[in-house]
């Protein structure tokens, strides 16, 4: 890369940096990016850069692979139904241990090593995420969000800290639930009036043709996104991600993005370049 190209990149990013300075961006961190050391380190640096230029990133994470690893160590077979983990009490204890005690703190340490300041919390802290059991309760302690109490986030964000939130919620009676991190991210984004919701995934974004990498939907709106689901263009695991984005936009989030976390620095490419890298959905 020559000097002219470097200057061009910085010039392209400048208006986006100015536009998003002081704005909150909620990022769901998951998929392969959590397992590959190079991708993890690139993500930590990207979060640090966002914070350094004045953006307020809030990171929500799951931790499926790590949970499965610990279940295997403890000789417990993970069970899934319709893509959701069947979570009994013993499994829930492991989910809490792994998400809150290991995955969360690994992310915090990774970001802090860059010189930025991250703070790890869960949905239990400050009663941030209130929940109830999902559907008829057949998935056990799998939950859905009933209310977000974002007050605990305000002092952290205002002081320049980066909140790292594990997707555990609880009922008013104190029963913990394992909640899909995509939906937690969407609900938190809505509750804090975030500028953007960004989901890091193991796909390019929404594809019009499932196996055609050239069919990426680069930009769409709420109505078109709903149509993509109704017409079964969006299928399988992309359905809940798209629905999560739709719900967040309907509650006031300005833009939602589904991007490929397997690409290094995809976060910065989506936020700070003209073309982006994934799918952007707007109201």
From Swiss-Prot:
Keyword presence, Oxidoreductase: no
Cited CDD domains: AAK_NAGK-C
InterPro entries named in the record: AceGlu_kinase-like_sf, AcgluKinase_fam, ArgB, Asp/Glu/Uridylate_kinase, NAGK-C
Protein name: Acetylglutamate kinase
Keywords recorded for this protein, A-Z: Amino-acid biosynthesis, Arginine biosynthesis, ATP-binding, Cytoplasm, Kinase, Nucleotide-binding, Transferase
SUPFAM superfamilies registered for this protein in UniProt: Carbamate kinase-like
Location relative to the cell: Cytoplasm
Top-level taxonomy: Bacteria, Bacillati, Cyanobacteriota, Cyanophyceae, Synechococcales
Gene: argB
Membership in a protein family: Belongs to the acetylglutamate kinase family. ArgB subfamily.
Residues with site note (Transition state stabilizer): 28, 241
NCBIfam families: argB
GO MF terms held by the record: acetylglutamate kinase activity; ATP binding
Listed HAMAP family: ArgB
Record field: catalytic activity: N-acetyl-L-glutamate + ATP = N-acetyl-L-glutamyl 5-phosphate + ADP
UniProt keyword annotation of Kinase present: yes
Enzyme superclass (EC): transferase
Functional summary from the UniProt entry: Catalyzes the ATP-dependent phosphorylation of N-acetyl-L-glutamate.
Residues given in the record as substrate binding sites: 63-64, 85, 178
Example of a GO biological process term: L-arginine biosynthetic process
Main location: cytoplasm
GO cellular component, one term: cytoplasm
This enzyme's EC code(s): 2.7.2.8
Pfam family, one: AA_kinase
Pathway: Amino-acid biosynthesis; L-arginine biosynthesis; N(2)-acetyl-L-ornithine from L-glutamate: step 2/4
């Amino acid at each position: 890369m020559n000097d002219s190209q470097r200057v061009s990149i910085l010039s392209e990013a400048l208006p986006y940096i100015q536009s998003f300075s002081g704005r909150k961006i909620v990022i769901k961190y998951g998929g392969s990016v959590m397992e590959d050391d190079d991708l993890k380190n690139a993500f930590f640096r990207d979060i640090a850069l966002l914070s350094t230029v004045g953006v307020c990133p809030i990171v929500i994470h799951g931790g499926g692979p790590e949970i499965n690893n610990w279940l295997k160590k403890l000789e417990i077979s993970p069970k899934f139904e319709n893509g959701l983990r069947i979570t009994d009490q013993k499994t829930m204890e492991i989910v809490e241990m792994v998400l809150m005690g290991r995955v969360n703190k690994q992310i915090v340490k990774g970001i802090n090593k860059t010189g930025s300041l991250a703070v790890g919390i869960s949905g239990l802290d400050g009663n941030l995420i209130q929940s109830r059991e999902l559907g008829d309760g057949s998935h056990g302690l799998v939950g859905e969000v009933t209310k977000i109490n974002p007050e605990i986030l305000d002092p952290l964000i205002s002081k320049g800290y980066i909140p790292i939130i594990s997707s555990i919620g609880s009922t008013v009676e104190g029963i913990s639930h394992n909640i899909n991190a995509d939906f937690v991210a969407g609900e938190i984004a809505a509750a804090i009036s975030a500028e953007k919701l960004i989901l890091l995934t193991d796909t390019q974004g929404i594809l019009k043709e499932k196996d055609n990498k050239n069919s990426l939907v680069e930009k769409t709106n709420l109505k078109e996104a709903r149509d993509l689901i109704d017409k079964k263009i969006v299928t399988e695991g992309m359905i809940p991600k798209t629905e999560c984005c739709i719900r967040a936009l309907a509650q006031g989030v300005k833009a939602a993005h589904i991007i490929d976390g397997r690409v290094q620095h995809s976060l910065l490419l989506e936020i700070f370049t003209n073309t982006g890298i994934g799918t952007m959905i707007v109201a």
